Regions:
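A short beta-strand-loop structural module common to alpha/beta enzyme folds
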Residues: 28-39
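Helix-adjacent hinge/juxtasegments
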Residues: 48-85
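Structural motif
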Residues: 38-47
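Glycine-rich phosphate/diphosphate-binding loop of Rossmann-like nucleotide-binding domains
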Residues: 5-24
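A general structural signal for well-ordered alpha-helical segments in protein cores
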Residues: 15, 46, 71-72, 116, ...
């Protein structure tokens, strides 16, 4: 499976750990992140990931910044993207199962690299439950066409 990954200066070590895990499982990571701790702007690395997910180039996206908030906000500006800020594995599972999230946003300053790998593993292996959640997820996109 192809997965797109991007990170700012807070996440190079996290990205390396995640990419190593993905490769060990036979996945194809698409790297849009920085490899240094030199200060950069997270949207420059998040938008390419969101585009990959939005247009179907990647099945899932992984974005990493200090708090995870700015990355998630940037990604969620793209059509068909549902980026979820996750800080523990259980939240990653619920983001997939109940919200059909397709991008996981990881807060590097509030998690560890091993936790991030565990969250990614849980995120990409959890199916969307559909059912009552499908109706709710559909309403997320409805705002893009609705007149309020």
């Amino acid at each position: 499976m192809k997965l797109s990954i991007g990170n700012d200066h807070a996440g190079p070590d996290y990205k390396k750990a995640i990419v190593d895990y993905l490769l060990s499982q036979g996945h194809e990571p698409i790297n849009h992140g920085t490899d240094t701790a030199d200060s950069v702007d997270y949207p420059d690395f998040v938008h390419p990931v969101a585009k990959d997910v939005s247009n179907g180039t990647a099945a899932f996206g992984i974005i990493i910044c200090g708090s995870g908030n700015g990355a998630a906000m940037s990604a969620n500006k793209h059509p068909n993207v549902r980026a979820a800020l996750c800080w523990v594995k259980e939240i990653a599972v619920l983001a997939r199962a109940h919200n059909n999230a397709n991008i996981i946003s990881i807060p590097a300053r509030y998690t560890s690299a091993p936790q991030a790998v565990a969250m990614v593993r849980a995120f990409i292996s959890t199916p969307f439950e559909g059912g009552r959640h499908q109706r709710r997820v559909a309403k997320i996109s409805d705002c893009c066409t609705a007149q309020f």
